[in-house]
Structure formats: C-alpha cells, structure tokens
C-alpha cells in the first residue's frame, strides 16, 4: 500500500465513528418524551386529550410569606414539603376528565402520593371534567395568575429521599401513564 493510503485510514475510521451515532438518531433513535423517557419540566405532554405541563417543583416553607398561601402546616422533623405546580388543558373538541392519580418515585422505587389539601386552598389541583380549551388552573384564577402559574400537588418527602434523584412524577389516567422528571 502506498504511504499516503496509510495516513487516510485513521481519518476515514474517525469519520465513520463520528457519523455512526448520527445515523442511529436519524433511524428512529428518538424517544417519546413523557412515555419512553421522562419529560422535562416546562414541556406540555398530551394524554387522553389533555395537555399536562409541570411548571416548577419547589420546597415549601410556610414560615415565609410567599409560601403561606400554598400550605399552612410545617413539615414534621426529618421531612420536607414540596409543591409541584402544573397545568392541565383540554386540547380536544370534547369534554375530558383530568387525571386523578399522581405518584412521585425516587431512584430507589420509593413511592409518594400527594398530601390532601383543604378544599378552600386556591392553589390545590382538583381533578375535574374540562370543556374544550378549558384548563386547570382556571384562566384568571389566583393560581393561574400567581408566580407559579399552576395548580399545586403537595408532597411530603423524608429528607434523605430528596437525594435519591431523579425524582419523577407519574400521572396516570385510564390506563395511560406520563412521566416528568422533577427539577429539585
């Protein structure tokens, strides 16, 4: 083989190695957000004619003024309270019911269900049937106009479980499931 041919072999091998992953992505390597892989906060994910968007997940402290509106009772020692603020909008042309089953899972498969909130909590997510183009929270409501722009699910976690990341919110409705990775 000529000497110049030996110099081209490593260049061609490197080019092929770099091009291979691009070919895999182009051939259906893309995953479905919320179904195959957890969706990131801020993305609208459709399920059963309803778009679900998790806007923000944050620790709540009822001793500070902004959080007093969200929750009145402090977390017990060794635990923390987190609010998951979300929006659910009917994008179909028919009435649709919103999800009522929510679970947060950590990377150790520990599962946490939402804490009950008082009926008069203006930020509480309450599942219901929505007309076309209607949302939870309702347009013009305190929850929709507030800094989080969403209705709240309240979760109580043992402090050590907040380190078992990623934490994922699973939303289930009529046998369908969507998952969001929580940014905490």
Describe the function of each predicted region.
Residues 1-25:
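Sec-dependent bacterial lipoprotein signal peptides
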Residues 2-3, 23, 27-184:
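Conserved functional micro-motifs across diverse proteins
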């Amino acid at each position: 083989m000529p000497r110049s041919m030996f110099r081209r072999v490593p260049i061609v091998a490197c080019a092929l190695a770099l091009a291979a992953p691009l070919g895999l992505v182009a051939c259906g390597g893309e995953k479905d957000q919320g179904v195959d892989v957890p969706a990131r906060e801020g993305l609208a994910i459709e399920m059963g004619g309803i778009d679900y968007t998790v806007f923000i997940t944050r620790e709540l402290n009822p001793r500070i003024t902004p959080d007093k509106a969200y929750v009145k009772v402090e977390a017990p020692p060794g635990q923390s309270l987190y609010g998951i603020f979300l929006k659910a909008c009917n994008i179909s042309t028919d009435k649709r019911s919103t999800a009522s089953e929510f679970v947060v899972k950590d990377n150790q498969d520990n599962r946490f269900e939402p804490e009950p909130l008082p009926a008069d909590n203006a930020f509480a997510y309450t599942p219901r049937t929505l007309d076309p183009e209607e949302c939870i929270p309702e347009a013009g409501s305190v929850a929709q106009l507030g800094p989080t722009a969403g209705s709240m699910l309240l979760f109580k976690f043992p402090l050590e479980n907040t380190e078992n990341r990623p934490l994922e919110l699973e939303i289930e409705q009529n046998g369908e499931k969507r998952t969001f990775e929580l940014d905490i």
